Design a protein with these regions (language model features):
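C-terminal segment of classical bacterial N-terminal signal peptides
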Residues: 21-32
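Short, cysteine-centered beta-strand-loop-beta hairpins and adjacent loop/turn segments enriched
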Residues: 113-115, 140-150
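Short, low-complexity N-terminal intrinsically disordered segments enriched in polar/charged residues
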Residues: 32-79, 100, 187-196
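Short beta-strand edge/turn micro-motifs at domain boundaries
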Residues: 34-39, 133, 152-182
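A solvent-exposed, acidic/Ser-Thr-rich amphipathic alpha-helical stretch
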Residues: 51, 55, 73-128
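Bacterial N-terminal signal peptides that target proteins for export
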Residues: 3-18
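A short hydrophobic beta-strand element
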Residues: 130-140
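Hydrophobic/aromatic beta-strand elements that line small-molecule binding cavities or substrate pockets
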Residues: 106, 120-125, 138-140, 154-160, ...
């Protein structure tokens, strides 16, 4: 068999093995989710819940939403890991990486008169060892001038168990409605620039 043909077969075999491995890994995740009976939780997390010792995923989520809705930067800092591996990707700040970025981003939101309030709902929680991730939706309002406007965001948050407490490592948020996205960005950014 010519060398070129052997190389093609080897490349094809490697590609198939890689594809099969990916399918198996995805199947394991899907099977694990099915085994956990993952159904969306519709009862919202508002931040008014009992925080307890922050050893449970829902407590860590409640801590974040309490910090956000009460404009508590110290609590935001406590909720996020103190690690340069922290990453945030959302409609206000783009992709931000580093231990100080949650503080910087949320400080801008909190200084804004847009007065954003949200709750987390229609979510699932998934856990693998020292990591859990929550995937769901945020709904709430923000102020634009004199009136309140609705806010709907697809959201995911990843936490890592560090010294017995869940610390947020990653947040991603997306606003599907392009008009709403533009209005929200303008309200928060213009208000934040006026307050500086």
């Amino acid at each position: 068999m010519p060398m070129q043909q052997q190389s093609r077969r080897l490349a094809s075999a490697v590609a198939l093995l890689s594809l099969a491995s990916t399918v198996v890994l995805l199947s394991i995740s899907l099977d694990a989710a099915k085994a956990q009976g993952v159904k969306p939780i519709l009862e919202p997390i508002t931040g008014k819940e009992e925080l307890g010792d922050l050893s449970q995923p829902q407590q860590a989520l409640a801590q974040f939403y309490r910090a956000f809705n009460t404009r508590d930067l110290k609590m935001i800092d406590e909720n996020f890991a103190h690690s340069d591996e922290v990453a945030i990707d959302n409609h206000l700040g783009g992709i931000r990486r580093g231990a100080d970025q949650p503080h910087v981003m949320y400080e801008g939101v909190f200084k804004s008169p847009a007065d954003v309030h949200v709750e987390f709902w229609d979510y699932t929680i998934h856990r693998a060892g020292d990591v859990f991730w929550a995937v769901g939706r945020e709904r709430g309002t923000y102020r634009d001038g004199e009136g309140a406007k609705p806010l709907n965001i697809r959201t995911s948050r990843i936490f890592q168990l560090i010294d017995g407490r869940w610390r947020q490592m990653h947040h991603h948020g997306s606003i599907e409605n392009a008009t709403l996205l533009g209005e929200y960005q303008n309200a928060v950014r213009s208000a934040a620039s006026k307050s500086q």
